[in-house]
Amino acid sequence: MFGKKCEKYVRNYINERGSYMSITVNLYYIGTNGNARKFAEDMVSSGIVDAVRAEEGNERYEYFFPMDDPETVLLIDRWKNQEAIDIHHKSEMMKQIAELRDKYKLRLRVERYVDEGK
């Protein structure tokens, strides 16, 4: 049952856009003393998360907390295409994000996945 729902979603998605492409970036924010989680909480409470989600081309922006690593926060960030990412990276929000990351002395590990379809 889940498979058919998923297939229907993908078909509708492709039909709406003619083709699809998504770029998913997994960002692991790594800190100490709970700072990664504090960073994510500040991102939400400051409104930055809502602002990123409202940007043209953003398809997903969600934080997750690994059960086996309390000092890491995973952000799954998905965009329609590279152009949307480039615009986001030049935005004022990126400066705010960098300032928060510096405030909490976080390290960053990045994984990038491209899903293309015609």
Where are these regions (language model features)?
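Short, well-ordered beta-strand segments in beta-rich or mixed alpha/beta enzyme
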Residues: 23-30, 60-89
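Residue-level signal for well-ordered alpha-helical positions
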Residues: 42, 64, 88-91, 100
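Glycine-rich beta-strand-turn "strand-cap" elements at beta-sheet edges
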Residues: 15-18, 28, 59-71, 96-118
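Short amphipathic alpha-helical segments
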Residues: 35-58, 93-96
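Short N-terminal leader segment in a subset of presequences, especially plant chloroplast
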Residues: 10, 29-34
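Short, Lys/Arg-enriched N-terminal segments with co-localized hydrophobic residues
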Residues: 4-20
